[in-house]
Amino acid sequence: MGNCEGFNRRAFLGSVAVGVGSSAILTSNAQGQENKGQENASAKPEQTQQFVASYPILQNVTETSASIAWALNTPSTGWVEWGTTPALGKIARNSEFGLNPFEEDFLSARISGLAPNTKYYYRTATAAFSYRTAYDKSATEPQYSDVYSFTTCGPNAKSGSFFVMNDTHNTIPTIREHVKLADELKPDFILWNGDLCSFYMDAQHIKENIANPTNSPYAAERPIIFVPGNHDRRGSWARNLKKCLTTWEQDDPKFYSLGYNYAFRQGPIAAILLDTGEDKPDWHPAWSEMANYEPYRELQTAWLMKALERPEIKSAPYIVAFCHIPLYDKNPKANPGNILDRWASFQWPCCQMWSPLFEKYGVQLAVAAHQHRFSYAEPTKDRSWAQIVGGGPEMANACSIYCYADENEMKLTCTKLDDKSELGSWTYKPRV
């Protein structure tokens, strides 16, 4: 992890923290029997401290909702102000069990009740918050981000597009080059297809490599969609990744634990997000009995069947599935992911469960990663769907995947990141 670049907070926060009071402190000291005699106690946070450690990260935009997360430098509370004009006017908070949020490293909020294919504006608000006792607490004036905008997705959009980067493994120069190319192509969303980092040991690692890898608002208006990779499950902080990369809201509580599985429409494209889990079986000694993916994949299969039956998915001209570990490998000796030897080249257990559903419902393309080398597999008589696999973390083998679709065709292009040469392009006709 030594190749992670340091975070220049001074330069960054000079541009992101606006509307900050210089000395005002908002103090809440509720009256009650327990706090008598404590009214003058002080627990004031330092007002001159910069509380925000990243620009907003727009994520998981659907027809009716969106989520925003941002990183912190100090324990804080916060919210998102939003509306259909830059004047905003509404507030979203990530409240739970009657309590507004109070976090040390990341804040997030989900905006709901939105309309499809509609432009919205938002900004984040962050106030450092401190407790001395249960009733003696104080907050600073909020720090506000700039006002940003996004457009909800929906089936009525005339076109749809996406950009895929994968296996960045905390290689910040590669991430920045991906983002630079995405800025030129202007896709509807960026899909980060797993192995964002090699492992996760603390919040700072996530802040540097995911929340703010470019020292710019790279995901403030173009949403990031996260598909987990096997390395995204490793390390003591892996279970906290959802603080920064928020999970989707599931319609059926039975599938609540499938936080990163989702299906949505962006114009003519139906996107299916799947989680292939780890690259070794649950009983592999490397996991020390900490892996439990077999029932997780079975639950995903039940979810996938329901997702593909949804009218807006079933009627899509194009259906694209995204997963980190490939579901197919042309090498008959490739590691299938269910043996003790080394690590999986592809995920045969997932393929056995999901490929029949791909066949039945007409999934045309699986977008995968993991192998650190580009490949494309055309459909065959035994497999009706194509598969593209992205490259690796180093510039020499990194590549980006871009897709644009309208009512006539869906075109997929893969580009080498170092010299921008084209590795190939493929077109797909509407399935319905």
State where each predicted segment sits.
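N-terminal secretory signal peptides and thylakoid transit peptides that target proteins
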Residues: M1-V20
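C-terminal segment of N-terminal export signals and the immediately downstream linker at the start
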Residues: L26-S67
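N-terminal active-site segment of His-dependent metallophosphoesterases
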Residues: A53, N60-I68, N73-W79, T84-F102, ...
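Extended active-site neighborhood of metal-dependent phosphoesterases/phosphodiesterases
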Residues: I57, Y121-T151, Q204-K314, D341-S345, ...
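Short, flexible loop/turn segments at beta-strand junctions in immunoglobulin-like
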Residues: I111-P116
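Active-site neighborhood of phospho(di)ester-bond hydrolases with catalytic His/Asp-centered motifs
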Residues: V164-N166, I190-D195, I224-N230, V320-C323, ...
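Short acidic, glycine-rich surface-loop motifs adjacent to enzyme active sites
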Residues: C197, P311-P332
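A short C-terminal boundary segment appended to hydrolase-like catalytic domains
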Residues: Y404-V432
